[in-house]
Curated annotation (Swiss-Prot):
Coiled coil: none
Its biological purpose: This reaction introduces a second double bond into the aromatic ring system.
A GO cellular component entry from the record: cytosol
Gene: aroC
Name recorded for this polypeptide: Chorismate synthase
A GO biological-process term: chorismate biosynthetic process
Amino acid sequence: MLRWQTAGESHGEALVAMIEGMPSGVRVTSQDIRDALARRRLGYGRGARMKFEQDQVRLLTGVRFGSTLGSPIAIEIGNTEWPKWTEVMSADPLDHELAREGRNAPLSRPRPGHADLTGMRKYGFDDARPVLERSSARETASRVALGEVAALFLEQVAGIRTVSHVISIGGAGVESDNTPLPGPDDVAALDASPVRTLDKDAEERMVARIDEAKAKADTLGGVIEVIAYGVPAGIGTYVESDRRLDAALAAAVMGIQAIKGVEIGDGFLEAGRPGSMAHDEMVPGDDGCIARLSNRAGGIEGGMSNGQPIRVRAAMKPIPSIPRALRTVDITTGEAAQAINQRSDSTAVPAAAVVAEAMVRLTLAQHLLEKFGGDSIEETRRNIEGYLASWPEHMR
């Protein structure tokens, strides 16, 4: 069983990510992780932190000579700003007065749209600092690191590859649902785009919308999509609701900070179509295999992958750390106030696409291993090959 967990605070000394259940023999290096984290820092509209944030990666356990060992993998991502925060984020006790002065002073004006107020209520804090430190999207660096390990496993074991792109930012973006989907070979071109799209007209519209938001000291959300190619049919199951692949993918992507909606395939568009135009008809293919005339289901039927590309879309709300600050209540006085304004981005939609890609990779790896098992990548590969070879010829 593949399991993962992350630890660490936004301005703490380091983030730590762990993954257990990865088979031995997966080729992975520290540079692979660094390259993945660099992709997360890309995107027009990012804040000042992205300019100096250099993720210091250490593969602590589970990898030897560039190959996984089958034991738990631990990854440390150091914080280059840590020297500035050693007192504010000290794990050891500070003098009471010192702990409440200057930068250490409690943050008592919770931000609307953040975890601040409810987190303070839930965990008994009189300060938003402990809440915002862990709820910060900085934590997603850990998931991107783990997602890269999962990506390498998926490609090496079964040729599965993923790609992510941005559909829209602030309502501006790709204007046609018939725009060709990007493929795995388009990753470099997408990384080079300031807003992670292959559509140059849409790129101009999105950049202009971000510039407008910056000028107004505002923030923007958007819509992203992840596509997975090469996933064999039969991953996931219809027999229990909690083991359905679409449910797992939706939960994984919904768990990303600021994501407020997820759909598989055409999702909400399907609700407005008659049944005769909503499903993916099957015909005999030229190669003797079954072919589909469309992919409205997004590669998943009955909770299982059906062999077509898997498409997952997500809606990201605007970042709630707004430069001009929203109205709130100061919890120390009970009086109206302006919310605290932590350094943030105008938009992080392109980065969210990279994070969503990581979560799709982790979920696919988890369900692939649930189906095929294997202590080594060679064993998993043999199991997959045997499964595919077992299909009757007329059902391939």
